[in-house]
């Protein structure tokens, strides 16, 4: 349960915590070519804990015999493009040895939930309690008997707040900036508008609410962070369903040999990543031809324009389902029942609205 730096001095990328369970139904994220039933041999609940999901992912890795094809404990430190190919510098961390390689294509699949965004609030430096980002949250039992402030209004804020409540926090106050999550919270959990400042051990909110605090947990999101890429290759975006400058959400508009995977905010996860990977594979192999810049711009603008009009979770689910469906149809990825996934996602969202404490008890 390491936080901070790993054994090599690099930031720990892991944002998981001890009692983490899937917050979305497994039926919506299953690999099309490797089912949960195939892996476990028996049906399992729709919302498995992290250890079960990890075991499932490892099973798919073993089935594909992938480990022998990966150089582990290597840190890519620099990527540049010389007009023909990519020059990559990497560090073998185990042997502390640098090497340089040349590649025709680069795929960036580093994720974007590892480098925390940490806002500043007046009074943070003099706050006598504990302040941490949800990235470093590991065990809710640490907050038993404490007054906890959680800042944020997305999945991390939701789950961290409920974890602290379940494991005995004295109170949990969730501060949101724009819109509240609006669930029917249990007694001891409440949402208030936007932290203004900390005064001693007291949190002062912009709606006038005041709350004694022992700990402040910043569930304030993450940064797309690519320190190894030269500036002309970096995707610069916030967390959104369709990042700009990516054709089909994958191909870098300014250099078609640079491919990004998994850079979107996500309802679909494993199946979307797979559809992106199949699409990227076919681009590299020349099976999919990239159109001219005018067509690329038109396609990107179409998706970005649709994204900007989304108003609620059901519309967002529809948007990402249609995006993943389009990618799927461009390759030979195995069949996916997108309409069933769409239906399950919407039921899941409605179950959360009905009872945020019990939605994981449902089966799909």
Protein language model features and the residues they cover:
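Glycine-rich dinucleotide-binding loop and its adjacent helix/turn
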Residues: 36-39, 49, 53, 99, ...
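C-terminal, flexible cofactor-proximal segment of oxidoreductases
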Residues: 257-364
């Amino acid at each position: 349960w390491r936080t901070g730096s790993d054994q090599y001095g690099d930031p720990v990328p892991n944002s998981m915590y001890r009692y983490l369970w899937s917050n979305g139904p497994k039926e919506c994220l299953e690999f099309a070519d490797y089912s949960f039933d195939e892996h476990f041999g028996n049906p399992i609940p729709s919302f498995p804990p992290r250890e079960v999901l990890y075991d499932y992912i490892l099973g798919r890795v073993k089935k594909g015999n992938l480990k022998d094809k990966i150089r582990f404990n290597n840190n890519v430190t620099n990527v540049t493009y010389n007009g023909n190919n990519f020059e990559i510098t990497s560090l073998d961390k185990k042997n502390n040895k640098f090497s340089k390689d040349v590649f025709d294509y680069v795929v960036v699949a580093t994720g974007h939930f590892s480098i925390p965004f940490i806002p500043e609030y007046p009074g943070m430096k003099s706050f006598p309690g504990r302040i941490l980002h949800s990235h470093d949250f590991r065990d809710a039992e640490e907050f038993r008997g404490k007054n906890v402030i959680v800042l944020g209004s997305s999945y991390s804020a939701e789950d961290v707040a409920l974890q602290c409540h379940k494991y005995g926090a004295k109170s949990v106050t969730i501060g949101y900036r724009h819109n509240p999550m609006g669930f029917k919270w249990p007694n001891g959990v409440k949402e208030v508008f936007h932290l203004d400042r900390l005064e001693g051990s007291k949190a002062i909110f912009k709606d006038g609410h005041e709350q004694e605090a022992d700990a402040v947990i910043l569930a304030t999101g993450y940064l797309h962070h690519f320190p190894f890429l030269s500036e002309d290759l970096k995707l610069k975006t916030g967390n959104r369903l369709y990042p700009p400058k990516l054709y089909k959400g994958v191909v870098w508009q300014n250099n078609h040999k640079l491919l990004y995977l998994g850079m979107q905010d996500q309802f679909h996860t494993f199946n979307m990543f797979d559809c992106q990977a199949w699409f990227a594979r076919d681009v590299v192999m020349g099976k999919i031809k990239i159109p001219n810049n005018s067509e690329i711009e038109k396609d990107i603008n179409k998706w970005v324009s649709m994204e900007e009009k989304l108003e609620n979770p059901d519309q967002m689910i529809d948007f990402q389902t249609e995006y993943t469906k389009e990618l799927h149809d461009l390759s030979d990825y195995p069949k996916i029942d997108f309409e069933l996934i769409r239906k399950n996602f919407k039921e899941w969202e409605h179950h959360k609205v009905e009872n945020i404490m019990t939605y994981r008890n449902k089966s799909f």
